Amino acid sequence: ESRITLWVPRIHEQHTRRIWNSNSRVSPDIRITSTNRPWTQARYSDLAITTGGQSSIEALCLGVPTIALPELAAQKDFVYFLSSIGACISVPDFATADLRHLATTAIATKTLRESLSRIALQTIDGGGSSRIIDTVRSLI
């Protein structure tokens, strides 16, 4: 299937509509899914639009290219770090950003999505659980 899938977790439908303009419809080639269960939808998505919280970490783990719209200070710091290493596209000012253009460009540019995905996967080494177990054992 040549359809592009956007994963939009934890972002209200009204914000998603703003991305595409309230009076326009999303292209029939684009499917938007907003489930908060990444293991069921995100891993099959071509692009994620997140707020820079836990869903961004889930997208990293799954290698899903991400556009981040941070809302809280901690999210802004995390998104700044991710964007500085090329793991996501940061949108620091949601109110003035041309999100439709940004999302459309990211969707249309396969090399950009592949680069974001590759860098995202490189930031996750899969050893977090082992390090936690080792730390807990060292305390016992």
Question: What kind of feature is each model-predicted range?
Answer:
Residues 1-140:
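Nucleotide-activated sugar donor-binding and catalytic core shared by glycosyltransferases
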